[in-house]
Amino acid sequence: KIYQVGGAVRDEMLGKVSKDLDLLVVGVELNKLAKILKPFGKVNMVGKAFGIIKFKPERSEEDIDISVPRIDSKSTGKGHRDFEVKLGKGITLQQDQLRRDFWMNALAKDVETGEIHDVEGQGKVDIENQQVRVIGPQAFKDDPLRMLRAVQFAARFDFSIEPNTLDQIKKNVRLIKTISADRFQEEFRKMFEKGTPSIGVNYLKETGILRQLFPKSSGNFPIEFDKLDKKAFPAFLAILLKEHSFTDIQKKMRLSNEDARAVSEVMYYMAMTDTGKQEDSEIGLVHFVGQTSAKGISNVEAVLSVTRKTPISNRLKMMKRAGKPTSMKELGIGGRDLVKLGLKGKKIGDALQFSLDHAIESGNNDPKYLLDTVKSKFGVK
């Protein structure tokens, strides 16, 4: 028997389109299944320990996860990456369903008949009641990441977390710190990009997950997360974890270099504007833009949009209309002009920076005026 399992069945019942295709084949050993599939495409046994085959059919660009039923017990190893797994031809569909995290994720659809198999109707009930409910009392001890997944699913589908499940998370919340960092990032990202972030953030606070992972978090946030652009994940993290250092965040999240830099740039901008320093001035703004990545700028712009402050791009346009340079490229003089004055080495860079700041402050970008100012400042005769 072949069944479609996992999120795709849940999403179908929610009326959502899913790109996932996970199949479960009952009544056959894994190795025999691999032999059956081999003539029809590429078989990858990378998930053999978990009873999973990655199968790419001929003329297809996408892999399909095809598995045999299994029974999991608690996760083991560093970061809880490994499970104690039992495979076997005699394991039933229902046994496989009961190993899953939440009832709404334990649905199985008969590929041949279209019939939905739901243990005691629990999954359908939870979807109708719009709630996330854990299957067994050991679920969070077996895999602590499920606590964060419960929050992620609640945010993603605008669901509530069933009261008993919520209590179980609170009782086991300390175990969340045993999970490896890269597994956190995926759940936080889904919570923000695919759901209603405020629901997730409220549950992170209520369950104690936020305090366990980031002890300095006050739980007070200056913006409405739901209004943030969905591409602004670094901005979301920078605001959610604003009391923490960038190093703390990167240690817990293991972000890509690009995202990590953007988080640090948003945090820097927020810190400077909160104290009324540099970035509130035109000079400070130009300095910031000149040192910041494109992704950092777009994430700062996302924050400014939500807080209804003037976008960086608009401020730069106003400066240009006033005849002020917004970068070294727009400065009325260049390095060659300073060499002709007799300046060398570091003094050239210092003089250029001085000229840029002075042109912005004075509103005068005239080359002769700037060269005369440099002569006076740097003692050139």
Language model regions located:
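Catalytic cores of the polymerase beta-like nucleotidyltransferase superfamily
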Residues: 1-381
